[in-house]
Regions:
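Conserved short beta-strand edge segments in small beta-sheet-based binding/regulatory domains
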Residues: 88-100
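Short, low-order "capping/linker" segments at domain edges
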Residues: 102-115
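Bacterial signal peptide processing site
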Residues: 18-20
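Post-signal-peptide N-terminal segment of Sec-exported extracytoplasmic proteins
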Residues: 35-67, 73-74
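Positively charged n-region of N-terminal signal peptides that target proteins for export
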Residues: 1-4
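Short amphipathic alpha-helices in soluble, non-transmembrane regions
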Residues: 44-47, 79-88
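Short glycine-/aliphatic-rich beta-strand segments at the starts of folded cytosolic domains
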Residues: 23-35
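C-terminal motif of bacterial Sec signal peptides marking the signal peptidase cleavage site
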Residues: 13-16
Length: 115
């Protein structure tokens, strides 16, 4: 019984420590994503949760800078920016659809850059 418990704990630890991404292939990029608040942060970062190839995503509401570490063999920077735009947030190169932006919570409606 004791051996079974130790085996299960070792298996859980091994699985939880492995992201499946080859860290030697990770690329880190910084770019602008417009937003306002903590709710924006949750939505922006959440748009990349569980996306294959994304290792880490962090948006800073103080300077609108997004930092993403990803495996460029699994996902491109353009795809990442599109996923963020799909939830209503403009970046330096991708614009969210007006209808999606209009559905953001009031505190999340940032001043949109000119088209």
């Amino acid at each position: 019984m004791k051996n079974n418990i130790l085996f299960i704990l070792a298996a859980i630890l091994t699985i939880s420590c492995s992201s499946g991404i080859d860290t030697d292939k990770l690329k880190t990029e910084k770019f602008t994503v417009y937003g306002n608040c903590g709710m924006c942060k949750k939505t922006i970062e959440g748009s990349l949760d569980g996306v294959k190839g994304i290792e880490e995503a962090n948006w800073n509401p103080k300077n609108d800078k997004m930092t993403v570490s990803f495996d460029s063999e699994l996902i491109t920077l353009e795809q990442i920016k599109q996923k963020i735009a799909d939830v209503g947030y403009d970046s330096d190169s991708h614009r969210a659809k007006d209808k999606v932006y209009d559905n953001l919570h009031g505190c999340c409606k940032y001043e949109r850059p000119k088209k």
